[in-house]
């Protein structure tokens, strides 16, 4: 039903494999009066789990420790809803690109893939938008994983907190297909990592580093922003009013790359990441190319 609020105050829950802790397709709620409030700490011991999957306004105050397994997603926003990580610490583990398992702390929206466009419209999944806001802390602790991901015209990602890249080949914010991202906070990395990327902005997406925004990376082959596109699409756009401090051997503040070079720039398969969840579905899918693996609830 609609307008049914979900308040989770259980101290701790554990997810094993292919599970979703809170799922709601109710689109109601506001920042002051959320449809979902989660105060529960969520731990994943396995893989391909979702902490919160929501269409309404959701506030997360719990800590999510999803670092043990691969392919875990902290929160996923659909149907133009908003998920706000108000006070929580969301930690994601690794990704296995070859096995289609991606760790993402916060994700929003879905846009048709090239494979979808080959199908009749009636057989395509529903495109959807979402909004994600981080006011807490995101730790990206596994290779090839992402802090914040937004896809689609109308989808937004806003970081007011801290995104920390704590493993090789990790990315702070990934914006694609006309999504818009704002950084008011900090994107940084742990000591000793390499090949980290602050922001990827792709296919007409836009990234605005606001006046208070800081992208500070000190790592071998660190990259502040990658602007890229698929064939026939437009490059991503960046507006910088804040601070970029990118240091380390082989580091670059900004790089422009055509799609054919994206694998080399980001690591295995990053250009093919999409989150495939039709609006209203009870299962979610993280898709790499043509290979799909679905959580079950």
Question: Which functions belong to the PLM regions below?
Answer:
Residues 1-297:
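Long, low-complexity, polar and repeat-rich extracellular regions
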């Amino acid at each position: 039903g609609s307008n049914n609020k979900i308040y989770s105050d259980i101290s701790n829950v554990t997810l094993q494999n292919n599970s979703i802790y809170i799922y709601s397709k109710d689109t109601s709620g506001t920042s002051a009066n959320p449809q979902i409030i989660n105060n529960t700490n969520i731990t994943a011991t396995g893989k391909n789990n979702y902490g919160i999957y929501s269409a309404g306004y959701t506030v997360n105050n719990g800590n999510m420790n999803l670092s043990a397994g691969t392919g875990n997603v902290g929160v996923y926003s659909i149907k133009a809803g908003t998920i706000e990580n108000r006070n929580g610490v969301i930690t994601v583990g690794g990704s296995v690109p070859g096995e289609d398992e991606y760790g993402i702390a916060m994700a929003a929206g879905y846009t048709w893939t090239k494979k979808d466009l080959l199908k009749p419209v009636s057989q395509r999944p529903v495109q959807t938008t979402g909004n994600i806001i981080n006011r807490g802390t995101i730790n990206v602790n596994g290779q090839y994983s992402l802090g914040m991901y937004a896809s689609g015209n109308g989808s937004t990602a806003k970081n007011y907190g801290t995104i920390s890249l704590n493993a090789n080949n990790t990315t702070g914010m990934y914006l694609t297909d006309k999504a818009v991202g704002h950084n008011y906070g900090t994107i940084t990395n742990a000591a000793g990592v390499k090949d980290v990327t602050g922001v990827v902005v792709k296919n007409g997406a836009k990234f605005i580093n606001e006046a208070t925004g800081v992208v500070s990376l000190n790592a071998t082959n660190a990259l502040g922003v990658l602007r890229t596109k698929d064939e026939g699409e437009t490059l991503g756009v960046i507006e910088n009013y804040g601070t970029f401090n990118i240091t380390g051997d082989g580091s670059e503040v900004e790089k422009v790359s055509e799609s054919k070079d994206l694998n080399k720039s980001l690591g295995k398969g990053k250009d093919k990441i999409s989150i495939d969840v039709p609006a209203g579905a009870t299962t979610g899918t993280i898709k790499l190319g043509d290979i799909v693996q679905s959580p079950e609830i």
